[in-house]
Amino acid sequence: MEEADLTLPLSQDTFHDLWNNVFLSTENESLPPPEGLLSQNMDFWEDPETMQETKNVPTAPTVPAISNYAGEHGFNLEFNDSGTAKSVTSTYSVKLGKLFCQLAKTTPIGVLVKEEPPQGAVIRATAVYKKTEHVGEVVKRCPHHQSEDLSDNKSHLIRVEGSQLAQYFEDPNTRRHSVTVPYERPQLGSEMTTILLSFMCNSSCMGGMNRRPILTILTLETTEGEVLGRRCFEVRVCACPGRDRKTEEGNLEKSGTKQTKKRKSAPAPDTSTAKKSKSASSGEDEDKEIYTLSIRGRNRYLWFKSLNDGLELMDKTGPKIKQEIPAPSSGKRLLKGGSDSD
C-alpha cells in the first residue's frame, strides 16, 4: 500500500511520507560544518584586482625623503629648455630648481639611467608640501576642480598622460597620493625615456595648495617598492610660467647682489670710539692731560681763553671754592626758579 502511494503524483499529502523514507548516508556526517568552509581567511566579497593593487602599494614613510639620490643606476631627470616667453606652457629654472607650468598642461620630463633597472621597475610621482609646517598634510586638488572632474582619481594632483598603464594609489596609513608608470627602455638612438606629467590644480587655489609651495618627488622603484633612485624639484602651477620664472630669477639675482653690497660696504670698527672709552675709564689721567683746541676767530679765542684762565685759577686756589659753588640740579628747575623770583 505504501509503495502504491509513493507512485502517485507528488502532492502535499504524499510529501510527508516521502520525506520520512529519504535515506541519509552516514558519510555526510563526517563532513565539516558549513561554517568551517568560510573560516579559512577567504573573503568572497574582495575584488581580485583590488587585492592585487593593494598588495603592490609599498608602505610609505610618514615624511618622504626629498634629497636627491642617483643610486647604483644613475637615476637622473632632464627638462626641456623652454625659455621665459609668455607663450610657453611649462618651463624649468635650473637656478631655482623649480618647474613652472600651467594647469592641466602636459609637461615632458626625461628620465635617464646609466644602468638599466630590474625588470618591472616603475617610476612613482608624489607631491609633498615644501615647508615643515605643512609637510604633514596631503597635497590634494581644491574642491572646485574636483567637482568638475568625473574620473576615479579626481582628488590626485599629479596625472600621467599618454599611458594606459598608469596606476594611482593612496597610501592606507598616510593618505598620500602617488601615481606610477612602468619604466620603459630608451628607444633606439635615444639616451632617455620621456614621461608626461600634468598638474591638475593651481598653486593659488583656495582649499587646495593655497599658495603653499610644493615639491614633486620622482622615484625609481622595483615592483616590491624598493627605491633605486630619487629626484626632487619644486613646482609652481600658474597662468603664465614664463613670466613667473623670469620674476623669481630676477628676485634671486637682486637678493644676491644686495647681500654682496652689504658685505663690501660694512663699516670698519671705529678706533676713536675705543680710544675714548678707554681714556674715559681713567678720570684722573684726563685731568692732567693737555689738549690742543683750534678756534676760528680772535674774539672767540679770547672768550675761551678767559674761560680757561678762570678754570686754571680755580684749580690753583683749591677744592674749597669748588664746594662753595652749588652745582645746578637741572636746567629746567633753574629756569623755573628764575621765573618765580621775577
Curated annotation (Swiss-Prot):
Residues 244-287, 318-342 are annotated as: Disordered. Residues 288-317 are annotated as: Oligomerization. GO terms for cellular component: cytoplasm; mitochondrion; nucleus. Its cofactor is Zn(2+). The record marks K86 as: Interaction with DNA. SUPFAM superfamilies: p53 tetramerization domain (SSF47719), p53-like transcription factors (SSF49417). Residues 244-256 have a biased composition (Basic and acidic residues). Residues 271-282 have a biased composition (Low complexity). Residues 236-243 are annotated as: Interaction with DNA. It comes from the Eukaryota. Residues 1-35 are annotated as: Transcription activation (acidic). InterPro entries: p53-like_TF_DNA-bd_sf, p53/RUNT-type_TF_DNA-bd_sf, p53_DNA-bd, p53_tetramer_sf, p53_tetrameristn, p53_transactivation_domain, p53_tumour_suppressor. Residues 68-255 bind DNA. Binds 1 zinc ion per subunit. One of its GO terms (molecular function) is metal ion binding. Zn(2+) binds at C142, H145, C201, C205. Its main location: cytoplasm. Keywords: Activator, Apoptosis, Cell cycle, Cytoplasm, DNA-binding, Metal-binding, Nucleus, Phosphoprotein, Transcription, Transcription regulation, Tumor suppressor, Zinc. GO terms for biological process: apoptotic process; DNA damage response; positive regulation of transcription by RNA polymerase II; protein tetramerization. The keyword Disulfide bond does not apply. Binds DNA as a homotetramer. Belongs to the p53 family. Multifunctional transcription factor that induces cell cycle arrest, DNA repair or apoptosis upon binding to its target DNA sequence. Acts as a tumor suppressor in many tumor types; induces growth arrest or apoptosis depending on the physiological circumstances and cell type. Negatively regulates cell division by controlling expression of a set of genes required for this process. One of the activated genes is an inhibitor of cyclin-dependent kinases. Apoptosis induction seems to be mediated either by stimulation of BAX and FAS antigen expression, or by repression of Bcl-2 expression. This is Cellular tumor antigen p53.
